């Protein structure tokens, strides 16, 4: 039987069907394309561990560099600001110290002039056989600075005993002028009391001290510090200063009068200077 006579069955397919081989071919092509797209979407090109470590190290080093730059810039800005503020504040603080020092210096200098006008000898320090006249204005100027700082420190540490009111910035110098007027009044009182009897002078100084405290202070901290200054100053005066043979207009001046004057004068002066320091600092 020849090949032509062999009957090959041909199955029937629906219209539009191109054959089983074409279908398989199209299905295989579609499946391959879908697989490629799926694989390309699911998997990205992988990096080695060394490459990943290098990338992480470079990123961290860049972040460290950026943070250091920011920190350096902030430090420079803070340093500039702090230097400027410190410089200006130091100048202001020094000027305030000079004002307080000047109050103590001027008051003591004028008090010495009053003593000289009354033809009284200047106070000398007696240490055994060594006698000398110290620069009282400069000494009391430094004492005034210590008092001014002590008043402000006391108010900060014990606010319940501080002064009731604190004046505004614009009225501070008005209060300083009032303190100067109080110093002048105290000096005039000293000058007049040199020619008054002992009992009257003590009463006048006590009244003057109480008035100065009531007008300029009225605080518990102020009266405590002024009292401490008065007591310590009086003790040093009694033990160190030589007041023997004091003569006023040829008549021997009683030493007891000076001894009773000193506490009241120190109390009044410390009240004025302390409140000036409380005002400025």
UniProtKB/Swiss-Prot annotation:
Residues 1-93, 160-170, 216-221 are cytoplasmic. GO terms for cellular component: endoplasmic reticulum; endoplasmic reticulum membrane. The chain crosses the membrane at residues 94-120, 135-159, 171-186, 190-215, 222-256, 261-281. Keywords: Endoplasmic reticulum, Membrane, Phosphoprotein, Transmembrane, Transmembrane helix. GO terms for biological process: ergosterol biosynthetic process; sterol biosynthetic process. The modification Phosphoserine is found at residue 28. The keyword Transcription regulation does not apply. It is a multi-pass membrane protein. Residues 121-134, 187-189, 257-260 are lumenal. The keyword Glycosyltransferase does not apply. It is found in: Endoplasmic reticulum membrane. This is INSIG family protein. It comes from Schizosaccharomyces pombe (strain 972 / ATCC 24843) (Fission yeast). Belongs to the INSIG family. Its main location: endoplasmic reticulum. It comes from the Eukaryota. Pfam families: INSIG (PF07281). GO terms for molecular function: protein folding chaperone.
